[in-house]
Amino acid sequence: MVLTQLRIASRRSQLAMVQTNWVQAELEQAHPGLSISVEAMATQGDKILDVALAKIGDKGLFTKELEAQMLVGRADIAVHSLKDLPTNLPEGLMLGCVTEREDPADALVVNQKNAEHQLDTLPEGAIVGTSSLRRLAQLRHHYPHLVFKDVRGNVITRLEKLDAGNYDCLILAAAGLTRLGFGDRIHQLIPSEISLHAVGQGALGIECVEGHPEVLEAIKALEHKPTAQRCLAERALLRELEGGCQVPIGVNSRIEANELLLTGMVASLDGKRLIRDQQRGPIDRCEAIGKELAETLKSQGAGEILAEIFAAVRPEA
């Protein structure tokens, strides 16, 4: 069966549309005869901006509405920031493609008042804006003298709040800033020794309906195998820990020769307990490496930390 048209479901946030438009352009270049349309929509995570993400709940916060469009036959694929895509997908859907990763690091963004500071020179009581429990826990561990405040909204809104003086600095994904044209606002890339990034951060995941080989073949033109292998390991670790996008689990992965080196971290919300370890193995065992590292972290107490966090941030009824 020859594929003649492709319907993409996307979040309608500015960053999501930049990413989806890139996917559309790349697919049109790879398949000149293919007619591609985009349907943009708001997800639950886009609509609820006055509650911390972890309190809303984690299952499909930024993906469920897009998946519903595919399941009822109104869309063929959905484009996600891979870090937002749950590791367990609805029956009938699959992760069909992972694109080449941008720099997955977290970035420090400062206002003019703090232009002379790096993360480790911020004064006591400086207000750091982040909506991520992962960043919060790691930064509390290393910088207990700083004050952390939740920040919601799209990237532009967050930058406006920063420049208005509501925060001294923000911690954001470097990849998102770069894709939106705000790479010049990156004041410092935070070393992985301080902040391990989110699972899948910096990569795009293209979700599709199972049983449609022509769609899968079309989107595979955008697949970047080394990124996919790294992200498979990261997602296997997250799945094995039964974590989600809104818990303090951080990772870093590297491919060295034919081996994959995966580092993983679980921390308590107050940052006082932080468990970190790594696993190395042949790259064709990427998912097994993720599972094995998860078991190692569990043996060191990660399960107990996560159980406490799930109880503390359980979504409000």
Curated annotation (Swiss-Prot):
Keyword Transferase set for record: yes
Cofactor descriptive note: Binds 1 dipyrromethane group covalently.
Residues spanning the membrane: none
Modified-residue entries (S-(dipyrrolylmethanemethyl)cysteine), positions: 245
Keywords linked to the UniProt accession: Chlorophyll biosynthesis, Porphyrin biosynthesis, Transferase
EC id: 2.5.1.61
SUPFAM superfamilies: Periplasmic binding protein-like II (SSF53850), Porphobilinogen deaminase (hydroxymethylbilane synthase), C-terminal domain (SSF54782)
Obligatory cofactor(s): dipyrromethane
Biological process, per Gene Ontology: chlorophyll biosynthetic process; protoporphyrinogen IX biosynthetic process
Class of this enzyme: transferase
Cross-referenced CDD domains: PBP2_HuPBGD_like
One MF annotation (Gene Ontology) recorded for this entry: hydroxymethylbilane synthase activity
GO-annotated cellular components: cytoplasm
Biological or metabolic pathway of the protein: Porphyrin-containing compound metabolism; protoporphyrin-IX biosynthesis; coproporphyrinogen-III from 5-aminolevulinate: step 2/4; Porphyrin-containing compound metabolism; chlorophyll biosynthesis
Family affiliation: Belongs to the HMBS family.
Subunit field text: Monomer.
Function: Tetrapolymerization of the monopyrrole PBG into the hydroxymethylbilane pre-uroporphyrinogen in several discrete steps.
Misc. remarks from the entry: The porphobilinogen subunits are added to the dipyrromethane group.
HAMAP family: Porphobil_deam
NCBIfam families in the record: hemC
Protein name per the record: Porphobilinogen deaminase
Organism name: Prochlorococcus marinus (strain MIT 9313)
Encoding gene per record: hemC
